[in-house]
Amino acid sequence: MIFDMSNRLGAGAVVFTLAVLIGCQAKAEATSAAADISVEEAEPATLGSMDEQYAWVGDLGDRDALPGKPLYIEHCAGCHEAQVYKAPHTTWLELMSPQVLYRSITEGIMQSQAAHLSGGDKQHIVEYITQMRLGDPDAGPAVAWCEGSASEFSTLDENHLTGWGHDTRRYVSSDAAGFDRSQIDNLELKWSFGFPASTRARSQPTIAMGAVFVGSQDGTVYAFDLETGCVRWTFAARAEVRTGITLGKRGPEGIPTAYFGDIIANVYALDAKTGELVWHTSPDDHHSATLTGTPAFANGNLYVPVSSLEVVTAANPEYACCTFRGHVMAVNGDDGSVLWDSYAIPNTPISTGDTAAGTKIFAPSGAPVWTSPTIDVDRNLLIFGTGENYSSPADQNSDAVIAVRLDTGERLWSRQTFPDDAWNVACMMVDNPNCPEEDGPDYDQASSPLLVDIGAGKSVVVAGQKDGRVFALDWETGQNKLWEVKLGRGSIQGGVHFGMAADGTTVYVPINDMNDTRNGEWLDPETARPGVSAVNAVTGEVLWTHVQENVCGEGRPFCDPGVSAAITATDGAVIAGHLDGIIRIYDRNSGEIIWSYNTTTPVTGTNGVIARGGGISGSGPALGAGHMVINSGYGLYNHEAGNALLVFAPKATGSVSAR
């Protein structure tokens, strides 16, 4: 049975809110300079236990009372609560949909381990882990299938492949977009799709071959007809697909292929015309490894950034923290074979002592690679950013920009931009011995570094960080910081997230500047600067800043005006999805808002499921063939849930021909 999202997400309905990493206190937020609440009135909170991270309000009640608990402890916890390679930690299992988990233990990778369990026991275990009812496990995705010409793909035009996977600058020319600045005023919703039984929609859509390719929370990857929203094919991945879908040509025949990753660190290659699996591999056997950044494609190869949620697992004081190291792996696009692997931390973590609780400490660890790498084929260069260390002592590879050779993965240079940053979720709790002595501040390089041409044959690497700073580095050495500007206050959820954009020598910077850091601290609302800024990449001059006022209103405790999603630039405009669920398009020269749309307005999708957006985070707008496509809904990290894929086109153009 497909869950009815009109009941799940409609007005007055019960909404699931998963608060991973940041706690689950449902308090009113002061999130802009216009907020009413003062610092003195705020009541910041820390996490009291790991259970608070997964406080659901919805399908099932008291988790401890569910019949699946003793079954899980007896049959599953021995691997999934321990540091067992290839066994995803419970942290990840709780993020999956019940359908995906049930499929895994009945016909997937865990089939043999669960063979002795009855069907009822399997259902109880799945519902205990996810706190969601399974429904009909045999029901396929609720879709309207394409017929006739709507099911036909056009030729893959590599010249119009833009954004993550191909160009981290996220600039789309008017020619590639299929509409220009003069038509933005006429953008209107053309069709929508409601992802069934979903509280988040965070896979970067890709427009190509007359289709929209996108992943989803339940692991289904869709190929939609761009014109009508009917579905050409679907593919069931092993877990949620939050990366973008990268298109490329495979083999000497140039077969169009779709590449992507799921949240338990599987990489897939599909025939883009049929959805059939070509190959599958896993770039990391660590139990907490994940793929959050979109793989990049160049020279027939795929470059996969690898991150993890061991930062969450470490909140258990009995967990020996930590052993994961972030890295980028190059694989052959034809068969998935490994070409090279470049670790942010070159050496395997070693034991460095014990915590106050007597638990082993392993270090250095962490430095996850959250976002898509930047590639310059002509310079034989790949650049990526890293996050914080997970354990003490911190090393020089966390919060860093790293450059390697594209052909071998050999390190060329590394520039740490914030030193001594070791942090994990234990630091959000009182007296948790697994918190590193550095205690943060968790200032990741959370956005893809941009390689920007500044004229006269020169280029700079522009990097943005969660402390709110943006700066330019020499691309050849990583040294000689050419300029630096601070655009936000910075915090665990502050500063620059996911993706900046660049149009020529202008860099557009999204800022998420939440007052409630969800780390036991409130920041002064009078100093908040959530929104978008434009910066001259040559000089660092701030050309304009639009600070977004809080329009959330009462009754929306997880609403915020900041920009946590990647933004997209096109000729004359820059497009940003905000955490308040509103898409805003800014004039490139002035920063004036020239168009907006509230994605939280419920609409009926092409599959008959109500599509209602929420906080927009992670992925950004995709432009192509006369359309703009965006996902909305991010029921994680104290942001608003949603399940909407929304497709817009200029109404004056009528039916737009898809390339």
Predicted regions and their residues:
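Electrostatic cytochrome c docking/interface patches
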Residues: V39-L71, A142, S149
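The canonical Cys-X-X-Cys-His
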Residues: G68-Q83, L101, I125, I129
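Surface-exposed loop and turn segments in beta-propeller and other repeat-based domains
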Residues: G194-F195, S282-D285, D341-A363, L412-G440, ...
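Blade/loop signatures of beta-propeller domains
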Residues: C146-L189
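Repeat-blade elements of multi-bladed beta-propeller folds
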Residues: E158-G165, S198-T220, A239-V267, T290-A320, ...
